């Protein structure tokens, strides 16, 4: 029980911090944190809640397939399947899914992935080589959630990572809440920098507006 309360507090603090950055506009986004490994349970944001508010109904505890563990009238977020795929296939401890203007713009500039390189902040992703290059996959935003989940699952390759969904934000996961938040901050910095650089350079040679 102590672990549940501890993780609840941790997730609530993350929600507050991301809210101050306006990363949950119009009730969008969802976040989760693992509570137990065996059996697998995790806390996830309840669907349709105003994340700028803090209430006792912010989160609910679900099992390995996203079904509430305790009787509740709350519904887990629609994209809970993405979280279950991550927790069932990795040792990740926290998953953050947010919609920002920058991460949506990026998915309108590129097709299957965005490549970013030679930025110091890439070290926040535990990539230390000089001039490092990263590739962030972009998948289509299928309205059929099982199809979205299956396409997402193909890009889960470790205990930390990120996947962009076209016009539907980014999902980032990490070993724990600190690691996941650090990675999300790094990706959002990289997106913002890349978009500003393109605006100065006059756009991309191929791909700009191709997916808008």
From Swiss-Prot:
Pathway this chain belongs to: Amino-acid biosynthesis; L-methionine biosynthesis via salvage pathway; L-methionine from S-methyl-5-thio-alpha-D-ribose 1-phosphate: step 2/6
Annotated GO MF terms: methylthioribulose 1-phosphate dehydratase activity; zinc ion binding
Alphabetic keyword roster: Amino-acid biosynthesis, Lyase, Metal-binding, Methionine biosynthesis, Zinc
InterPro entries linked to this entry: Aldolase_II/adducin_N, Aldolase_II/adducin_N_sf, MethylthioRu-1-P_deHdtase_MtnB
Domain of life: Bacteria
Binding of Zn(2+), residues: 97, 99
Any one Gene Ontology cellular component term annotated for this protein: cytoplasm
Cofactor(s) for this UniProt protein: Zn(2+)
Entry EC number(s): 4.2.1.109
Pfam entry (one): Aldolase_II
Record-level GO BP terms: L-methionine salvage from methylthioadenosine
SUPFAM superfamilies in the record: AraD/HMP-PK domain-like
Annotated catalysed reactions: 5-(methylsulfanyl)-D-ribulose 1-phosphate = 5-methylsulfanyl-2,3-dioxopentyl phosphate + H2O
Cofactor comment text: Binds 1 zinc ion per subunit.
NCBIfam families linked to this entry: PRK06754.1 (NF005244), salvage_mtnB (TIGR03328)
HAMAP family linked to this entry: Salvage_MtnB
Subunit: Homotetramer.
Family assignment from sequence similarity: Belongs to the aldolase class II family. MtnB subfamily.
Biological role stated in the UniProt entry: Catalyzes the dehydration of methylthioribulose-1-phosphate (MTRu-1-P) into 2,3-diketo-5-methylthiopentyl-1-phosphate (DK-MTP-1-P).
Protein name: Methylthioribulose-1-phosphate dehydratase
């Amino acid at each position: 029980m102590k672990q549940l309360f501890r993780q609840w507090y941790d997730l609530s603090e993350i929600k507050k911090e991301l809210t101050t950055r306006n990363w949950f506009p119009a009730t969008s986004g969802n976040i989760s944190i693992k509570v137990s490994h065996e059996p697998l349970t995790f806390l996830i944001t309840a669907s349709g809640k105003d994340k700028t508010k803090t209430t006792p109904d912010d989160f609910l505890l679900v099992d390995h397939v996203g079904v509430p563990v305790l009787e509740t009238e709350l519904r887990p977020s629609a994209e809970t399947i993405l979280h279950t795929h991550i927790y069932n296939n990795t040792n990740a401890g926290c998953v953050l899914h947010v919609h920002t203007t920058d991460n949506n713009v990026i998915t309108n500039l590129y097709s299957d992935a965005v490549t970013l390189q030679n930025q110091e902040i890439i070290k926040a992703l535990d990539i230390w080589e000089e001039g490092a290059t990263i590739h962030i996959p972009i998948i289509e935003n299928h309205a059929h959630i099982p199809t979205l989940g299956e396409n997402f699952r193909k890009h889960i390759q470790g205990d930390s990572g990120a996947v962009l969904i076209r016009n539907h934000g980014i999902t980032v996961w990490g070993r724990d809440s600190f690691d996941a938040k650090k990675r999300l901050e790094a990706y959002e910095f990289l997106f913002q920098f890349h978009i500003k650089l393109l605006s100065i350079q006059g756009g991309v040679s191929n791909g700009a507006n191709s997916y808008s």
